[in-house]
Every structure is written in C-alpha cells, then in structure tokens.
Amino acid sequence: MIKAVCFDLDGTLVDSERLYLAGNVHAAQQMGYLLTCEDFLPLVGISDAQFQSQLNLLIDPGQQAEFAQLTQDFVDARIDRPESLAQPGADALLRALKLQQIKLALVTTSTAEYTHHMLQNTHWSDVFDVVITREQGRTKPAPDLYLQAMSQLNLPKAQILAVEDSPVGVRSAKAADLTCVQVQDLAPRSHLADELIDNLFELEKMIHA
C-alpha cells in the first residue's frame, strides 16, 4: 500500500521545461543564433554533465553566461503566472493525496530558491511534507536526493512511489530502489520505469488500484 509519493518538479508537476525552451530560443535569437526549440530539446531531462556537453554544441562557451541570464530573465518575467505553470491535473492530484493522508515529497535538482519560488507561485507551499533540492546531495541520476527524501519520510521503500518525467529522474529513483512511474512528456521514454502514464490524471487511479 502506497503511503508516500515523491514527485519530481520540472516537467512532472509544472510545465517549466516548455517555458525554459522558449527562453532558450529567445536568448539565442537575441544573441544572433538561428536556433529553434528542436535544437534545445535534447537539453531537457538530462544530467548536469550531459546538459553542459549539449549546450557547448549550441552556444559558444564564452557566451553562455549571457545566454543563461537572458534565458532566466525571460522565464522570470513569466513565472509568476501560476495558471500557466501547473501540469494538467497536478493541483487536484496533490490536494486529493493530501486529504487521503498520503505523505508527499518533492525531489528536484532545481535550487532551493527556485523551488520555493515555484511552490509559492503554484500555492503548494503547504502541500509537501518533505522538500529536497539540489543542495542536499549529488544530483540525478545519482540516488542521493531520493535517499534523503526516504530518510525524512521514514517509511519502508515498498510504501513509497516516485513520479518522474525523464529517464535521468527514473534512473535516480531506481538507484534508490524505489518503484517509479514515468509521466511521458518532452523527455524520452525510460525502459527502467515500472509504469508509464500519459498524464497525472491516471496516477491517482494507479495508486489506489
């Protein structure tokens, strides 16, 4: 019986990845690069090292600080719109699980500052029992962040479900020996996922099946 669910943030609960893709294209165009969303799509849902390697193929390393700032400025101007952030079904799912006394953990490789800002904007600051961010261990696909969450949840691993949208996230959860569901979106399908679903509406039915 599932007594806790660990959620990834970006791409799983919030549609921030599309926002960052748009920001990447905007920044690149501002800097004179003729790049599209398709060019930046390989950057979605990968490890930090892979991200840097892919970015080096697109943006000159000497211009990456400017590129990052322009991207972040684009995102910051739009991130305060909660109605455009949450993935379909996310808010209702979190509220329903909370009412059913299922513990909720957020396990993300995003920074604590970004994460708490996002939780405020989506009105989820009071939802999660545990929040784990990139400052608390090696980032995904290492299992560290999930192990931190498991320690704080203090439940047998068989009673904890992980929910991710990317192969890197799934690898992290599986490395922590958790059952993991992948919500398919922009990132490729993972062969390691225990279950694949198309959206969050399917998840509550699965938990109580």
Model regions: which residues?
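Asp-based, Mg2+/Mn2+-dependent phosphohydrolase catalytic module
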Residues: 1-3, 95-98, 111-209
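Conserved phosphate-coupling serine/threonine residues in phosphotransfer and NTP-handling enzymes
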Residues: 12, 108-110
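Helix-loop "lid/cap" segments that line or gate small-molecule binding pockets
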Residues: 27-28, 47-61, 118, 149-150
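Short, acidic loop-to-helix structural element flanking the phosphoryl-transfer center
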Residues: 77-106, 116, 143
